[in-house]
Amino acid sequence: MDVCLSSAQQPGRRGEGLSSPGGWLEAEKKGAPQKDSTGGVLEESNKIEPSLHSLQKFVPTDYASYTQEHYRFAGKEIVIQESIESYGAVVWPGAMALCQYLEEHAEELNFQDAKILEIGAGPGLVSIVASILGAQVTATDLPDVLGNLQYNLLKNTLQCTAHLPEVKELVWGEDLDKNFPKSAFYYDYVLASDVVYHHYFLDKLLTTMVYLSQPGTVLLWANKFRFSTDYEFLDKFKQVFDTTLLAEYPESSVKLFKGILKWD
């Protein structure tokens, strides 16, 4: 089995508690040589280390408990640290569906060196899969989610992906021009999963989706449809994006859409 994990901490049983994300990141940044499964020092560690030192360290939320859950996509075993204490620390059905689609359509999507931003990345599964497929990924979410997100990204991509994912704060609809100026940031794909549910920020979410979409940008959005407000959002989405239903997953009530921003 091909496992894409840092040797700093090997995966344990499903549901086994893990150490603090911040503590693991600090240990990685001290420069201890990385070893392969035979105990040999990896030659690539010197190339990765400068990137680690340049990372912004996000302080993890101190949830009472974490569990680790095992997934397999793109030929890799992926271990995600999750907590049921936060919506943003759990892998939801839309993320699973989107990962499945990315895996099954990898050749068509051609993520190799593509610039990708994920909205509402949560614990990071979708961003990890996109990174494994070769993309340059920026994973975004609210501040309290970023510590665990960064932990999972580094844990599953360090030394086994072409590009180390970046983590950035993104509050929907706020400071977009300042934090993501169009002159400096262009994305081939914008990814989102289960970002639409019963909350009060749907208009700001749509504003953010529109802002991040430039000519040539493809938005892939997977969502479990639970409430009437989900369909109301979809109607608004279709007004500003040329929308294609790419896949449906009846067992989980997830629909996956492709959106291209309308420019006329």
Curated annotation (Swiss-Prot):
GO biological process, one term: hormone-mediated apoptotic signaling pathway
A molecular-function term among this protein's GO annotations: protein-lysine N-methyltransferase activity
InterPro entries: Methyltransf_16, SAM-dependent_MTases_sf
UniProt KW keywords: Cytoplasm, Methyltransferase, Nucleus, S-adenosyl-L-methionine, Transferase
Residues reported to bind S-adenosyl-L-methionine: W92, G120, A121, G122, D141, W172, S193
Entry EC number(s): 2.1.1.-
Segments traversing the membrane: none
Skewed-composition ranges (Polar residues): 1-10
Consequence the record notes for mutating D141A: Abolishes methyltransferase activity
Gene3D superfamilies with a match to the protein in the record: Vaccinia Virus protein VP39
Root EC class: transferase
Region feature Disordered, mapped onto this chain: 1-46
Reactions that this protein is recorded to catalyse: L-lysyl-[protein] + S-adenosyl-L-methionine = N(6)-methyl-L-lysyl-[protein] + S-adenosyl-L-homocysteine + H(+); N(6)-methyl-L-lysyl-[protein] + S-adenosyl-L-methionine = N(6),N(6)-dimethyl-L-lysyl-[protein] + S-adenosyl-L-homocysteine + H(+); N(6),N(6)-dimethyl-L-lysyl-[protein] + S-adenosyl-L-methionine = N(6),N(6),N(6)-trimethyl-L-lysyl-[protein] + S-adenosyl-L-homocysteine + H(+)
Entry function: Protein-lysine N-methyltransferase using S-adenosyl-L-methionine as methyl donor. Mono-di and trimethylates 'Lys-943' of AARS1.
Similarity comment: Belongs to the methyltransferase superfamily. METTL21 family.
The protein's name in its UniProt record: Protein-lysine methyltransferase METTL21C
